[in-house]
Amino acid sequence: MKKNIYLLFLFTSLYTVAQQKIPLTQPDSVQFMTEIVIKGFESDRRLLETPVSAGIVSRSDVQRFSTASLLPALNIVPGVRMEERSPGSYRLSIRGSLLRSPFGVRNVKVYWNDIPFTDAGGNTYFNLVDQHSIAQIEILKGPGGSLYGANTGGVIILHPEEPPFLQENISAEHHFRVQVNGGSYGLLDENAQWKYQDKNISSLLTQSHLQSDGYRQNTRVRRDVIQWNGSAHLSEKDKLDWILMYADMYYQTPGGLNMQQMQENPRQARPGTAFTPGAVEQKAAIYNKTPFAGISNRHNFNKNWSNITSVMLAYTDFKNPFITNFETRKETNLGLRTKMVYHAITGKQDLKFIAGMEWLHNYSAINNYGNQRGKADTIQFKDKIRARQVSPFVQGEWMMGKKFQLQAGIGSNFFIYRYRRLTDADDSKKKKKLDGQLLPRLAGLFLISENISLYASVSKGFSPPAIGEVRPSEGSFHRNLQPEYGWNREIGVRGRTLANRLQFDITAYRFRLNDAIVRRIDSADAEYFVNAGGTNQKGIETFAEYVLVQNTTAFIKSAKLRASITLNDFSFTDYMIDDKNYSGNDLTGVAKTIWAGGFDIATRWGLYLNTSFTHTSKLPLNDGNTFYAPSYNILLGRLGWKKQFNAFSVELFTGVDNALNQLYSLGNDVNAFGNRYYNPAPKRNYYGGLIVTL
């Protein structure tokens, strides 16, 4: 019924648009996704000419919704799922990799341009990223080990805004932008930016503050970020990119509820039991203070040879008063990535060769204490862990004429942990060294026509257990936990047609994962991880966008439809624990069907309306498939007005999230003890804001 309401609204809007006598869209008046240049796998080509399954999230995609979170924009990309157990507690997966992530991002590598953002322990604090400073998010789906080291889910590349350089007639320019966004449950999202640009330098200084009281008890969040990133042409041969960031984040963790508790009072935090106190009593929360610095230099030796070298340094002060303990972590992370690139064009042949390596090092001092109502008590464990990854790689790319392209690459990964428990009588060092892995990838692309391409690829992925999995919060060191690995095969077609009004991207894949790492929770609500045999993951991902109107002289100057469909057939294979056989069961936490649609319309007067509807089918909450989260439908909308004046522009907007007032859980605790799977998301809520640009 609720789906039908959205469809009725959609078709009514389309009928209104159709009644107007509007000229046809001109082919060169629309920027298509297939025309966006992809940087991943060293392509530097249009997506139409790149043999990789990729999703693109632009700044305009983020601004279709409340800009307090990246979640709605990322969840439109087929095969990608971002969850929010509570404000600030994000999880991000590509093609089912959420199975391993109680929070944050695991099994997916993240980069800021060429600068590594994921640490050697396999963890990424994605919730520290200030979405206001991102111009584009590039998502490479499927294993990327041939060029990006350890991962089986995929790769995410964050791109800042980069205006053109080396234009002699450009004088120094300063631009300022201020945004304030407020809403239900005490939401306040404030952002201020100063951008400087001349013919050699582009820099962006950003300050942002986010806070919310949250929908549930014990879900308050506060995040402050100051960031300076930019690019500079040091000479005709050298270009330097940099990022300096300091993030201070605090968010409360309410804990999961069972179905009865969620239905009785979805706003409550996890209550106490006869054996353990509740989340409110223990003041369960996360405190994260992280400075991060990265630089990347590109040097062109001549027209054929170049080198790109990136260095990163980060330090994290992490505290987590939890229901059963109080954990502190001091993490120091170092990273180096360097690659030599040879590129030559001779006649109809375009040849590119890349060779390089990535080195990541993590040192973590982890202490566990008792938790006395949010204060650290008696020491339980005191550990020191070092993790190191070395990933050499080579890749060749051959463009034969204008029709055919071949990519072939192979990488390797060498991984080692060193662990020492200082509170044990035997405090000798322990070591876990993984055998080196060869990670090949072969991909090809054929241009069927000027606007349609067909591609296919075969690749191997490898992902060692993260520090949080080898040494989870309950304090044990799981030396027997093995890395997961598998082969991925996929084929896809993409392009544009119907007088360039319609663009489409369709991918089918099969990924067989061995020794899959899955999360479990014990009776004390402490997490631990086990290898679960294997998984068989088959999927189809489709995306389509249709431009109804693109005409700046008409009253309705633009109108656009978009839709994405994700079909997942994921199951366990060879998975037994004790006497229980889970082989053939659906993969935990993965919905079989996700459908997302959107309709955007803008007028010459500056008025605009963005809508989005998402249907998520039921999904299993435990490996035994005895509990499922119900399906749900989410409707979002944003109404606004933009006006460009001589020296500045103004935008006013208001919006609604969960307009259908659904009761659902957007971040489930899979395999939770006591059936406490559910983290209820906010009911219908509203926001509004103002943007001023000078």
Regions found by a protein language model. Give the residues of each.
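N-terminal periplasmic accessory domains that precede
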Residues: 70-73, 91-93, 108-111, 124-130, ...
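Extracytoplasmic beta-strand/coil segments of soluble accessory domains associated
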Residues: 71-115
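Short acidic/polar hinge/loop motifs at secondary-structure boundaries
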Residues: 115-141, 480
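Face-selective signature of the C-terminal outer-membrane beta-barrel domain
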Residues: 236-247, 283-424, 540, 544, ...
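Membrane-embedded beta-barrel scaffold of Gram-negative outer-membrane proteins
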Residues: 300, 306-312, 318-319, 447, ...
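Structural signature of Gram-negative outer-membrane beta-barrels, strongest in the C-terminal barrel
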Residues: 350-361, 383-512, 549, 558
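Gram-negative outer-membrane beta-barrel transporters
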Residues: 402, 508-512, 530-619, 691
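C-terminal beta-signal and adjacent terminal beta-strands/loops
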Residues: 509, 559, 618-620, 641-694
